[in-house]
């Protein structure tokens, strides 16, 4: 296609404008200023323009003719180009035959093969997963079978009495002393049945070489049992009995009542204490009794026999008030728990001190108190109440000192005194030198 030079196009446009604008103007000498033959140099009027056109008309016409021919060629070339472009467009709409078209079937086959290979890979992966799941299932089935066997064994054990799983001696009696009288010589777990009891129950019997036997009613030694219990729990008992006497428990107020009131022969209660320096001390009380539930398990004893721990059950003068000793004595007090308040205090001693006990206002002895490691504790340690709530025996150690271990046990009075034990009538004064600071 021939291109029209840029100068030709510009000339064509200029001549076209001049031809259309001045083609009908006829020169008139009346309005022309003939000063110079050069166009418009001194007199640029229409007269000069007409003269210029007349002079160059022939050349302009020749150039115009040339340009018209050139435009015709351009037009023809443009038409041809348009036809070619339309043909190419139409050709592009149809699938082109190329080398790619020839290999399309192979590509499709390869793609199909690849898809089949992928499917096979997935299939084998599924097979592996299925095998793994089958192994897991089989393993779980074995575990379930073993667990069912264990459950069956446990169910068989639970159907048998507790004595089949612990070492319980065959002797029995109304208390541990009667068990020893029947020939028992080893300390351990025994069943006893007090005279008024409806059924026998398990106790720990501490049997001495002389044949005298203590029935243990309370044990503290490591803080493993929480003694913050309600009325029913203290009535029935809680904690754990063990053949080696290495567990904490409260035998139960109802059992203690049946034991201590079954005979005309009174019982002696012994309190055994151990501090955190491993020093030990005792306090013995004659004619210990625990009333019935109707009397809220009232605690009574006849007198303090002796013991270097001192008579904390008789109260103690802490120096806080002239009435301290009177309001901290325990003889004759009823049992109190946080849900059954029987103390002499306007508040609830059992609730603020976190235990069940024979509270007055409140205590000088508190053997069911909170277990504090190391012994010494403070008001901040005792919680919101700020009261002395540890395992306390105020006549031996200060009120802010909690014992390491405690045992409460009873024995018939007629067996008390064997092998050098303190005898009735030989009571000692309390040793007040070891009270500690209050």
UniProtKB/Swiss-Prot annotation:
Residues 1-25 form the signal peptide. Heterohexamer; disulfide linked. Contains 2 sets of 3 non-identical chains (alpha, beta and gamma). The 2 heterotrimers are in head to head conformation with the N-termini in a small central domain. Conversion of fibrinogen to fibrin is triggered by thrombin, which cleaves fibrinopeptides A and B from alpha and beta chains, and thus exposes the N-terminal polymerization sites responsible for the formation of the soft clot. The soft clot is converted into the hard clot by factor XIIIA which catalyzes the epsilon-(gamma-glutamyl)lysine cross-linking between gamma chains (stronger) and between alpha chains (weaker) of different monomers. The lineage of its organism: Eukaryota, Metazoa, Chordata, Craniata, Vertebrata. Pfam families: Fib_alpha, Fibrinogen_C. It is found in: Secreted. The keyword Metal-binding applies. This is Fibrinogen gamma chain. GO terms for molecular function: extracellular matrix structural constituent; metal ion binding; protein-macromolecule adaptor activity; signaling receptor binding. A long coiled coil structure formed by 3 polypeptide chains connects the central nodule to the C-terminal domains (distal nodules). The long C-terminal ends of the alpha chains fold back, contributing a fourth strand to the coiled coil structure. Residues 167-414 form the Fibrinogen C-terminal domain. Glycans are attached at residue 76. Together with fibrinogen alpha (FGA) and fibrinogen beta (FGB), polymerizes to form an insoluble fibrin matrix. Has a major function in hemostasis as one of the primary components of blood clots. Disulfide bonds join 176-205, 349-362. GO terms for biological process: blood coagulation, common pathway; fibrinolysis; platelet aggregation; positive regulation of heterotypic cell-cell adhesion; protein polymerization. One of its GO terms (cellular component) is fibrinogen complex. Ca(2+) binds at residues 341, 343, 347. Keywords: Blood coagulation, Calcium, Coiled coil, Disulfide bond, Glycoprotein, Hemostasis, Metal-binding, Secreted, Signal.
């Amino acid at each position: 296609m021939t291109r029209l030079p840029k100068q030709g196009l510009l000339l064509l446009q200029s001549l076209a404008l001049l031809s259309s604008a001045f083609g009908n103007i006829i020169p008139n000498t009346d309005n022309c200023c003939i000063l110079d033959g050069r166009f418009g140099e001194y007199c640029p009027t229409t007269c000069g323009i007409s003269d210029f056109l007349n002079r160059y008309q022939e050349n302009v016409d020749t150039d115009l003719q040339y340009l018209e021919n050139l435009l015709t060629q351009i037009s023809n070339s443009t038409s041809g180009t348009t036809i070619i472009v339309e043909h190419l467009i139409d050709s592009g709409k149809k699938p082109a035959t190329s080398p790619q078209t020839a290999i399309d079937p192979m590509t499709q086959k390869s793609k199909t093969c690849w898809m089949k290979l992928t499917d096979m890979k997935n299939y084998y992966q599924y097979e592996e997963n299925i095998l793994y799941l089958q192994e897991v299932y089989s393993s779980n089935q074995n575990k379930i079978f073993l667990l069912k066997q264990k459950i069956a064994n446990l169910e068989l054990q639970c159907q048998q009495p507790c004595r089949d799983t612990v070492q319980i001696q065959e002797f029995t009696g109304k208390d541990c002393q009667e068990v020893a009288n029947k020939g028992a010589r080893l300390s351990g777990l025994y069943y006893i049945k007090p005279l008024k009891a409806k059924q026998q129950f398990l106790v720990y019997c501490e049997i001495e070489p002389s044949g005298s036997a203590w029935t243990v009613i309370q044990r503290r030694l490591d803080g493993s049992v929480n003694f913050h219990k309600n009325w029913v729990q203290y009535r029935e008992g809680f904690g754990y009995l063990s053949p080696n006497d290495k567990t904490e428990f409260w035998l139960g107020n109802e059992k203690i009542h049946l034991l201590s009131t079954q005979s005309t022969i009174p019982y002696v209660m012994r309190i055994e204490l151990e501090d955190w320096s491993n020093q030990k001390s005792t306090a013995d009380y004659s004619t210990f009794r625990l009333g019935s539930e109707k009397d809220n398990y009232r605690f009574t004893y006849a007198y303090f026999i002796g013991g270097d721990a001192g008579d904390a059950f008789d109260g103690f003068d802490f120096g806080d008030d002239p009435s301290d000793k009177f309001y901290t004595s325990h003889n004759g007090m009823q049992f109190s728990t946080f849900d059954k308040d029987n103390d002499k205090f306007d508040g609830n001693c059992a609730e603020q001190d976190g235990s069940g006990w024979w509270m007055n206002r409140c205590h000088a002895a508190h053997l069911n108190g909170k277990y504090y490691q190391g012994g010494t504790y403070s008001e901040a340690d005792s919680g919101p109440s700020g009261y002395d709530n540890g395992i306390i025996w105020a006549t031996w150690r200060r009120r802010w000192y909690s014992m390491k271990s405690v045992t409460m046990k009873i024995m018939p009075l007629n067996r008390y005194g064997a092998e050098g034990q303190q005898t009735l009538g030989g009571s000692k004064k309390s040793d007040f030198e070891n009270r500690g600071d209050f």
